[in-house]
Amino acid sequence: MRKLPTQFVDKVWGVDRLPSPFPHPSDQAIGEVWFEPPAELDQLLVKYIFANERLSVQAHPDDAQAQAMGLGTNGKSECWVITHAEPGATIAVGFHEQIDAGTMREAALDGSIVDLLVWHEVQPGDAFYIPAGTVHAIGGGVSLIEVQQNSDVTFRLFDYGRPRELHLDQGVEVSKTGPYPSRLRNRMDGDSGLLVDGPHFRLHYWRCGSAADFPALKPGDALVIPFSGTVSVDGEDLAVGECGLVSEPCKSALVGDALLLIAQPV
C-alpha cells in the first residue's frame, strides 16, 4: 500500500477549523483536501469537501463535451458520500421538473435557480452519484468525500453574489434540465454494497471484519478510503483522513474494524 500525498485547498467558503483528524494550516479557510492522484490510477481524484456555507450552483461537462470545448480529455462525473451533516443540512441535485435552457439561464441570472433545484436533506452515509451535466450544489454544514473523474472543469451558474467568474453559456450548454434520477441516490446500509457502477468508475463500500464478502473487484490497483475506523493493509495502518493505493486489494490482508470506500476505474 502507498498513502497518497494530501493538498489543502484554500476556499472563500472554507472552514476555519478542519475536523479531526486533519491538521489545519494557520490563517486559512480550508474548503477541500485533495489526495494526489497516483500515476497508476490517474483517472480518479479523491477529495474531502468542507462547506461552511452554500456553494455555487454548477455543472460539469462529459468527456465528449470537454473534448469539443478544448478542455481536455475528461469530463467530470462524481460521487458524494456524506461524512458529516448539521441538522437540516442539504445538498441540491437536479430540478423539481423539466425546464428549458432559456428558463435555466434566466433563473441563473436572477438567482431563482436555487428554488428550481431539489434540496435533499442528508445524513452521514448518504451517497449521491452525480453524472456529468447534473446541476448540483452543496449546502452549508455539509462535509463529504468526493470520488470523481480526474478533471477540475466546472461551470458555475450561480454563486450567491461572490466575486467569481460565472460560465452561463457553457453551463447551460452542458446541463441536464430535468429531475435527478432517484436510483442514483444510495446509502451505506449494511456491511457491503455498490454505490457507483460505471461508466467511468465503480465505488464499493465494505466493512472490514464483517461477514460480508469482499467486493468483486477487477484485477489491478484500487483506491481505499476509510470512511470510519482504521484498517491495517498488509501490516500498515490506513485511517480516516487518508487514502491509499492498494495493489490487488482482494489479495491483501485487510485487518481492523473500519468501513471502507474502494474505488476503481472501469
What are these regions (language model features)?
Residues 1-99, 160-181, 203, 263:
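Transition-metal
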Residues 46-48, 55, 72, 78-81, ...:
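His/acidic/aromatic-lined binding-pocket segments of jelly-roll/cupin-type domains
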Residues 50-54, 64, 74-75, 85-88, ...:
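Ligand-binding loop in jelly-roll beta-barrel domains
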Residues 84-124, 129:
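Intrinsically disordered, low-complexity linker/loop segments enriched in Gly/Pro
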Residues 97-115, 145-185, 264-266:
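Double-stranded beta-helix
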Residues 117-129, 232-252:
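Short acidic-glycine-tyrosine-enriched beta hairpin
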Residues 155-221:
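C-terminal amphipathic alpha-helical segment
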